[in-house]
Amino acid sequence: MNLSLPLNKDNSGNSGNSGNSGGSVCSSNNTLSPILSNSILSSPISSPRLISSSNNNNNNNNNNNNNNNNNNNNNNNNTINSDSNNNNNINNKPRKAGIQLDSDGCLIKRIIKEGYGEIPPPRSIVTVHYEGYLSNQVLFDSSVQRNSPFTFQMGTKSVIDAIELSISTMKVGQEAEIVTTQRYAFGKLGLPPFIPPNVSVIYKIKLLSYKLKSNDFTNFESLINKSKEEKEIGNQFFQKSNYKKSIRHYVKSIWILNDPEQTLGLNEMENKLLKDTLIILYLNLASCNIKLKDGKRGISNCEKILELGGNTTAKFYYRMGQAYSLNKQYDSAKRCLVQAIRLEPNDKLLRDELENIKKLQEENNK
């Protein structure tokens, strides 16, 4: 399995998040990307390997190699490393009571060993050792056994939410045990045949180091161009009626433009171009939401356009009216269509949509 993993997705195709989207507490329809290595997946999983004392001995034999890696990392001034005198083994017994990392108790962190310094800033590049267990203590993945620390960039949706959320609270050198339901792990579907459906998992994690991310874009023009590339891919999927994939690329395009590190200090012309580009992207997202009959998200994306303070067009009011109609907010939908017709009085499509909304409201009131 390639460790270059896709964005988390929910059933609507929108970028996943950790919030409760309805249904039972601690449940989710998300099928999230795991941390699983090629070496683990290349061998049969019918007899999963268990952590044993021999594994711990192997880990101890590899301490010198890990410490050498830490010493090399210290040459980078922007890299924060754990003490090279400490080995990279992960202790097995939590020393403190659990800390609830979410509002529903679906993600619990227990500190095994304290770290030092500051927690990683957003979008840092972090290096960790980890062990992943099913709830019956079966080990399904271990960077420790491979003597191969795992590195990824935070904020890129490249790991399951449980890993991302936990590491965002850890200091360098800290070791922790993470207990999570499927909501922040592999979702209701699991990852057959390696991870069963709808299971809780346990991770033991040690934060070895982090370094600040260097700028991806040297200037505003390259930032806009990268965003446009994602938007064009989204447009292509839209033309093919693949609205979920289209949403994915529109969201990524917005994510690029919403990075405060990249957009700080823009001049007036650049800020206008940034705002206009975001308005188009949110309008495209709303169109996808409407195609997928998701009025609630359609309204939300239209409201983001209002927050940006852009000039509202007939097309905007048309989309927002459609979204309100899907959400059965017919009075709001009619007001939007009336405003759209004021801006484009000769557009038959707008008048037809207004009549359609009136009919839907009448049927709903029967």
From Swiss-Prot:
GO terms for molecular function: peptidyl-prolyl cis-trans isomerase activity. It holds the Pfam family TPR_1. Residues 1-26, 47-97 are annotated as: Disordered. It comes from the Eukaryota. The keyword Secreted does not apply. Keywords: Isomerase, Repeat, Rotamase, TPR repeat. Inhibited by both FK506 and rapamycin. Residues 123-211 form the PPIase FKBP-type domain. It is an enzyme of class 5 (isomerase). TPR repeats lie at residues 227-260, 279-312, 314-347. InterPro entries: FKBP6/shu, PPIase_dom_sf, PPIase_FKBP_dom, TPR-like_helical_dom_sf, TPR_rpt. It catalyses: [protein]-peptidylproline (omega=180) = [protein]-peptidylproline (omega=0). Its EC number is 5.2.1.8. Residues 11-26, 47-92 have a biased composition (Low complexity). Belongs to the FKBP-type PPIase family. PPIases accelerate the folding of proteins by catalyzing the cis-trans isomerization of proline imidic peptide bonds in oligopeptides. This is FK506-binding protein 6. It comes from Dictyostelium discoideum (Social amoeba). The lineage of its organism: Eukaryota, Amoebozoa, Evosea, Eumycetozoa, Dictyostelia.
